[in-house]
A protein has these predicted regions:
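A short beta-turn/strand-edge loop motif at beta-sheet boundaries
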Residues: 356, 549-556, 804-808
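Substrate-binding/catalytic cleft of secreted carbohydrate-active enzymes
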Residues: 101-104, 111-290, 483, 487, ...
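Beta-strand/loop-rich accessory regions of lumenal/periplasmic or secreted enzymes
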Residues: 27, 589-598, 613, 627-914
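Active-site-adjacent substrate/metal-binding segments within catalytic domains
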Residues: 23-25, 37-188, 245, 695, ...
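Intrinsically disordered, low-complexity Pro/Gly/Ser/Thr-rich segments with frequent PxxP/GP/PP motifs
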Residues: 2-22, 564-600, 607, 615
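Terminal connector regions
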Residues: 30-33, 38-51, 592-635
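Extracellular glycan-associated modules
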Residues: 292-492
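Substrate-binding clefts and catalytic carboxylate motifs of secreted carbohydrate-active enzymes
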Residues: 178, 235-320, 490-583, 587-589, ...
Length: 914
């Protein structure tokens, strides 16, 4: 305690100090906390004031390029996390923070980088309690204005933001080290920020989340977003001697998260590699109402009000009101607006306001296919794309703003014209069919150009009677003749959805409501604190790694199981006391069973908590391993069905039938078009080659597009990773039958089919074919179907690429549409959650059952989902067991959706799935 004192001034500094011997150290594994209190008493000994806070004791060091905590080299498995709530935006209540921390701990994360600002104080208080390392970040992100980090007039602002953070947060033990900010340039003000921070807290180190490989002032370097090889080459064996922490890596926008094992193999190999923070934790969706407006055309195309777009009264009519910000009408990419005609009419009534001169996107389908938009203060542009982009501009009338005008744009196959208030104002020559591109029709926005980096007012206007026609019209616009007709007389609410605004990246490892995305199971597996590997199969010896830094493996109950396929045939418990960061050879007392031909054998190990923790109950699984055992006997040859099914051959079709089945092949197109089992039709569309899947969110982003660019790229398909796939035309295959023959052997009926799948629907011009010297790009398929008397179909499929190919195919396989009644799914493979070839070790092999609808994953932006890998067998059946069974001569992957791939490709929002 301090000696008695008197205060004559408003402030007085009193220094108190004591020696704390051998305190229990705070770590994420052992969040030991102490209460620090301060009492003020008067000379009579009566307490006049008292304050308390929670503190912890820890020490960080860097020795020989390695980061140490309490004398132990530390690996940091982190998530980046915004303060994000689907209802409250950036307001985080305590219950939500606790839920986040429970999920992080349950899925084996030990840290959070608070991107890109200090969190609310409660966040740090709870991190102290739960045991999570915090990389606390100065809120100085400049991003598009990074150059200010070099301007001396901004120095004090950088320093001031640093001071506020460090002075508030430095007594929280959870703060592992500081970050000088995010993407705020590489200038001297970053150095000043770190100088300021170190003057206030000399006990902690600093990193900086810049876009350079490193900053000279930081103690801990990046890089961010390296590949596993780049991480290894640039840092693992690099020359910079500072520890490395990837402040951002593995962008999990939408369906993503591949190669995580590869990163952590490199991290464990090199002591200097501390780990990294995945980008990022909480999906950014905000709850919005689904507000539909009626399309009065015969097609009733789904169209929805976005943002705060409003319907307002204007005289006797109701009109669309847009204020120039993120407000527009989203129209689904239905076939009726995916126009490729040689005629087009766009028409609408417009009441432009002042800000419309900033952009004025009235009716657009991307930046190329077709559109009507204002250019500056005095021009109106109409554009289409046939052999190239054609456009015509008309001068605006002097009374353009704050008056209603009728605008009509017409293309008649020879000429493009703009009409304003019934008078032709401009025209130009153009010809050819309009080319279709993968962007939706928007009213009041351009979906291709107005995304998260929009810097203009996109449409400040009121609009009414918006029409699109696949014919040339200058008057007499009848909704029943339109491809789209919106009169905005009413809106209908149909629930809610998670909005990502005008084009935010749909990052996230958990959904906005805190339910877990499938990638999290891989993250949990890769980051698990125990790992197992087989050392001696014969003796049953397994090597255990305890990757905990401070806790013994004795905190876990460990159970082993010997499985025959999915059946447990032996099991037992293990008592382990492996020290932290140590290995141990463990004997598993299994007995080799009598092997059954065709069965697989594997050893499963499960580690669960023995006691309740703040973040999970006893019994929570923290680690598991699946060790394949090299015990197998080949299947005995199956007794083949005797006899040959009957078949009939007509000019148009081949019918193969037997007891309880009938299959039909169309001889014209060479496809299997019907499968009837027990009088039930199973097929809705033919079996055919599949090279396409709906693009993933990362593939629809321009962020990494340059790495996927090739000579395939064509104008109009955007600037994204998916541009390569769209430009090659693999989403637009044209089926071309080449030959069809039938024969009969003792095996059954043999159907030999050769066909071609041409990429791009013949979109090449003659001059392109001449210059490139390639007549067609596509795949030649050789199919042999062998159908036996039991109705089993053996398919032998060989495909041969011809011509110019894309850099990669998003998928190579077969696809078919089956009856909705076949909604019961059972498979032997990895599961139960969605998994992909580069994200599959976190999903154990087993026999799983689900339904088609239950396998849906609600990514904020619809995309491919639901793959299951390493599949040995698959069944699709009705609830009565009627259906299809699939097997291959090797393990395979499958998806099954209640939606078409075309729907998944074209939908931009979950409410557009149908």
């Amino acid at each position: 305690s301090a000696a008695p004192f008197e205060m004559d001034a408003a402030e007085k500094t009193i220094q108190l100090h004591t020696l704390v011997q051998e305190p229990r150290k705070w770590t994420a594994e052992t969040p030991e906390l102490y209460t620090l209190g301060l009492e003020l008493s008067n000379p009579a000994g009566l307490q006049k004031d008292k304050i308390e806070t929670v503190i912890g004791f820890k020490k960080t060091e860097i020795k020989d390029g390695v980061f140490y905590l309490n004398g132990i080299p530390l690996k940091v498995n982190a998530q980046n996390s915004h303060m994000q709530h689907p209802e409250e935006g950036h307001v985080m209540d305590e219950a939500t923070i606790r839920k986040d921390f429970e999920l992080l701990k349950q899925f084996n994360f030990n840290a959070v980088r608070t991107s890109h600002y200090p969190p609310v104080n409660k966040y740090l208080e709870l991190a102290n309690e739960y045991g999570l390392y915090i990389i606390d970040e100065v809120g100085d992100e400049a991003h598009a204005s990074e150059w200010i980090s070099s301007l001396p007039e901004y120095e004090e602002m950088y320093r001031e933001r640093c001071r506020r953070m460090v002075l508030r947060d430095r007594n929280h033990p959870c703060v592992l080290f500081w970050s000088a900010g995010n993407e705020s340039g590489e200038g001297i003000n970053i150095t000043h920020t770190i100088e300021e921070g170190k003057s206030l807290d000399p006990t902690r180190f600093w990193m900086y989340g810049g876009n350079a490989f490193s900053h000279p002032a930081e103690d801990i370097i990046g890089p961010r977003y390296p590949t596993p090889m780049e991480l290894e080459m640039q840092v693992g064996i690099g020359e910079d001697s500072r520890p490395s922490f990837m402040d951002e890596y593995l962008s999990v926008a939408g369906n993503a998260g591949g190669a995580l094992d590869d990163y952590w193999e490199a991290i464990y190999r090199h002591p200097r590699l501390m780990g990294g923070a995945i980008w990022d934790f909480v999906s950014p969706g905000l709850t919005e109402r689904i507000r539909q407006v009626d399309d009065l055309s015969p097609f009733h195309t789904p169209a929805h009000l976005m943002g705060n777009a409003r319907l307002v009264k204007e005289g006797k009519n109701t009109v669309l009101d847009l204020n120039g910000h993120d407000q527009w009408v989203e129209v689904y990419r239905a076939d009726n607006v995916e126009l490729n005609s040689n005629e087009l009419t766009l028409t609408c009534r417009i009441y432009p306001r002042k800000l419309v001169s900033s952009c004025g996107s009235f009716i657009t389908k991307g930046n190329y296919q077709f559109g009507l938009q204002q250019r500056g203060k005095d021009k109106l542009e109409f554009y289409i794309y046939t052999d190239k982009k054609h456009s015509v501009c008309a001068s605006l009338p002097t009374d353009w703003e704050y008056n209603w005008h009728q605008v009509t744009c017409v293309y008649d196959g020879q000429k493009m014209s703009i009409y304003i208030d019934g008078a032709e104002k401009a025209s130009t020559q153009a010809s050819g069919n309009i080319r279709n591109f993968p962007y939706p029709v928007n009213i009041g926005r351009n979906a291709e150009t107005h995304g998260q980096e929009t810097s203009v007012y996109i449409c400040d206007a009121q609009m009414d009677e918006v029409g699109i026609f696949a014919k040339a019209l200058t008057s007499s616009f009848h909704p029943e003749e339109a491809a789209l007709w919106l009169d905005f007389e009413q809106e209908t609410e149909n629930g809610t959805f998670y909005s990502y605004g005008i084009g935010a990246r749909t990052y996230g490892s958990i959904w906005p409501d805190r339910s877990v995305q499938p990638e999290m199971w891989q993250m949990k597996k890769t980051g698990q604190p125990l790992s197992f590997s087989m050392s001696d199969v014969t003796e049953g010896v397994v090597e255990l790694w305890n990757r905990n830094h401070y806790t013994n493996a004795s905190r876990y109950a460990i159970r082993w199981e010997l499985k025959e396929d999915d059946k447990v045939i032996q099991s037992g418990d293990l008592a382990l006391s492996t020290a932290p960061l140590s290995q141990e050879l463990v004997h598993i007392p299994y007995k080799k069973p009598a092997l059954i031909p065709g069965k697989e054998y594997r050893l499963m190990l499960h580690a669960v908590l023995k006691k309740d923790e703040l973040w999970a109950k006893a019994g929570h699984e923290v680690a598991w391993e699946e060790l394949e055992l090299p015990w197998s006997l080949p299947c005995s040859s199956e007794e083949k069905a005797q006899g040959v099914p009957s078949y009939s051959l007509s000019e148009k079709e081949l019918v193969v039938s037997g007891d309880g089945f009938k299959y039909v092949f169309n001889r014209t197109d060479g496809q299997l078009t019907s499968m009837v089992i027990q009088d039930m039709e199973l097929l809705e569309s033919p079996l055919r080659l599949n090279l396409w899947r709906a693009p993933l969110a990362n593939e629809l982003d321009n962020w990494n597009a340059s790495s996927a660019r090739s000579s395939n790229w064509k104008e109009g398909y955007g600037y994204t990773v998916a541009t390569e796939m769209y430009s090659a035309g693999i989403d637009r295959l044209t089926h071309q039958p080449l030959s069809f023959s039938v024969s009969e052997t003792t095996e059954g009926v043999h159907i030999h089919i050769i066909d071609a799948e041409l990429m791009g629907k013949g979109e090449k011009e003659k001059k392109d074919l001449y210059i490139e010297g390639v007549q067609n790009n596509g795949i030649i398929n050789h199919y042999e179907y062998i159908i036996n008397s039991e109705g089993t179909i053996e398919i032998r499929h060989v495909l041969k690429p011809e011509g110019k190919m894309p850099l990669w195919f998003p998928r190579i396989g077969l696809t078919l549409t089956v009856s909705d009644a076949l909604d019961q799914v059972k498979w032997y493979g990895r599961g139960p959650q969605e998994n992909y070839p580069d994200r599959k070790t976190g999903y154990p092999t087993g026999i799983y059952a689900s339904t088609v609808q239950a396998m849906y994953e609600p990514y904020l932006m619809p995309q491919d989902y639901g793959l299951r890998t390493d599949v040995r067998g698959l069944q699709l059946t009705t609830d009565k067991g009627i259906g299809l069974q699939f097997k291959m001569n090797e393990w395979f992957n499958f998806n099954i959706y209640p939606y078409s791939t075309d729907n998944l490709t074209k939908a931009m929002y979950t409410y557009q799935l149908q």
